[in-house]
């Protein structure tokens, strides 16, 4: 794991306390789901439309919505300004897990985020419209989504991450609405293997994707994150792995997002010179 300099962090986060970044609320039509879906985009103060900026797609957790990150944390505007990037928070449904459901055609959130929303954002803002200018991460259900979408769409995203992510769904067959969209585990074991992050590791090659994983040691998802970390090490897949004291709550995520943005900023800077 890379060690971030605490003094550097303190300098960054006290540089700007005015939060001049702007927030737009968007409504984007999804052809795959035949409905309008809301998102918010945080635009850094420096954005005037004349410079292409990278984009972080930031996913919410189970039972939340597109404005959860904006309402429940206070640092997104400041982080967008410091790192000069767009932050897009799409609505991922109450319990979509960011899949294209093989059972319910009204839940096609992988297609919406990795294709439809990205196309709309690139057409309406001056973005770095390539994998070198895109990253995806999230918390809990969105942590699963960040890695799931990143692993499966490496032509779209160059970096991905997870905070307190449900990175292996198989130990939780009766939780968080998952069986509505991939079927009962006992009847559809292949779906449960194929729609979990742990089932996507064969898609990875060393160095092709920048990956960051963060989980609190007292989180109920800690063990599945540890298992993912061990498997990535076994496969020789480089990744940053952060374990700190903490549980599954907004206090943890409000801190974790700062480390994630540093990681993604380093990726964007090194790939867009």
How does the language model describe each region?
Residues 4-15:
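Sec-dependent N-terminal signal peptides
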Residues 20-273:
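Non-catalytic cap/lid and distal C-terminal segments of serine-dependent acyl enzymes
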